[in-house]
A protein has these predicted regions:
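Solvent-exposed coil/turn segments that connect beta secondary-structure elements
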Residues: 33-37, 78, 88-90, 98-104, ...
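Signal peptide-directed extracytoplasmic domains
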Residues: 66-125, 137-140
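Amphipathic beta-strand/beta-sheet edge segments enriched in Tyr/Trp
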Residues: 28-35, 177-224, 298-300, 320-326
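N-terminal segment of the mature soluble domain
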Residues: 46-68, 119-170, 263-287, 304-305
Length: 326
């Protein structure tokens, strides 16, 4: 490999390259009913909102009954970034609470909760019911069940990659998925007479299963929860030992300083990555040394599902190899 001269050149170029700022993540917000505007009622609602956010961060709907969680939620008001009162759909009073992301993730680590950190890519949903594409109304229950656990299901637009190609994890279909939807995650399904056939695509991995129900709404909601269960199992990481762990990551198809800057920003914004250090470069690829709070395989799988990167052929000296898509 070439010496680090090229890496230094790229670093110099980034000084004049703008990197888009990330949007505020809804993972750290929750709206809950509140009994009134008194401090006591507000603090009780804030604790409930913090529990809802921990569900979103961990993907575990039963997080509130985990050991130590109820006690820890008593300090939730100290973690609040902002809040405001709103009116619910039935006229009830609601409290919309935003928490400090670092404070909430720190709380989750202290409670030893597995966390799938932000930013999370959306999950494209391509489902046919009795041969016809499912519309937004039919998928409302699935979308709502995912949102409660911090997963955004999105519907395809015209020109979406062929469902068959996505479900088969074909490289071209996954690259189009990344370019068009900014994700490497998809749920492809067919329902016929209540029987469901499902494939969840996570980066370059496909998982398939069957379901049976006499109720289409129930089978869709169950499929959404099953997909979230699999996503959480794949991407949510428990706290690492104090010393962390090291790994070598190869990123290929970097053809400009702006792409290099985008990769570095993506890695440095991941709370599981303590440090990123360029080691060597060759052609349009870069070898990076990472210090992590989670296994590199877990982090790399998340990166491959982010819509920015796809799995690549193994490279010398790298534990994991990825190619830049956009």
């Amino acid at each position: 490999m070439r010496a680090l001269k090229r890496v230094v050149l790229w670093i110099g170029l980034i000084a004049v390259t703008a990197v888009p700022a990330m949007a505020v993540d809804s993972l750290y917000h929750a709206a809950v009913p509140v009994a009134g505007t008194s401090a006591a009622a507000r603090n009780q609602a804030i604790a409930a909102a913090a529990a809802a956010v921990l569900v979103q961060l961990s993907g575990n709907p039963d997080v509130a009954i985990q050991p130590g969680v109820a006690t820890a939620l008593a300090s939730a008001p100290a973690l609040v970034k902002d809040y405001h009162y709103t009116e619910g759909g039935n006229g009830s009073l609601m409290l919309d609470v935003g928490f400090d992301p670092q404070a909430l993730e720190s709380l989750a680590r202290r409670l030893a909760l597995p966390v799938w950190p932000s930013p999370r890519p959306p999950v494209l949903v391509e489902i046919r019911i009795d041969g016809h594409p499912a519309d937004a109304a039919a998928l409302a229950g699935l979308v709502e069940s995912g949102a409660a656990r911090g997963v955004q299901f999105i519907l395809p637009h015209a020109g979406a990659p062929a469902a068959a190609g996505v479900a088969a994890c074909q490289h071209d279909a996954l690259a189009q998925l990344a370019r068009d939807y900014g994700t490497g995650l998809a749920l492809v399904g067919q329902i016929s007479g209540g029987d469901g056939s499902w494939t969840l695509v996570t980066g370059d991995t496909c998982q398939s299963w069957q379901s049976v129900s006499t109720n289409t709404t129930s089978v869709l909601t169950a499929a959404g929860n099953a997909a979230v269960d699999r996503l959480v199992a794949r991407f949510a990481a428990a706290p690492a030992p104090a010393g962390g762990q090291a790994g070598a990551l190869w990123v290929g198809h970097l053809r400009s300083a702006s792409q290099y800057a985008a990769v570095m920003a993506l890695l440095r914004n991941d709370p599981r990555i303590r440090s990123v250090r360029p080691m060597a470069a060759e052609g349009d690829g870069l070898l990076l040394s990472l210090q992590l709070d989670a296994p590199l395989a877990t982090v790399a799988a998340d990166l491959a599902a982010s819509g920015h990167l796809v799995s690549a052929a193994p490279q010398p000296g790298a534990d994991v190899s990825l190619d830049w898509v956009r």
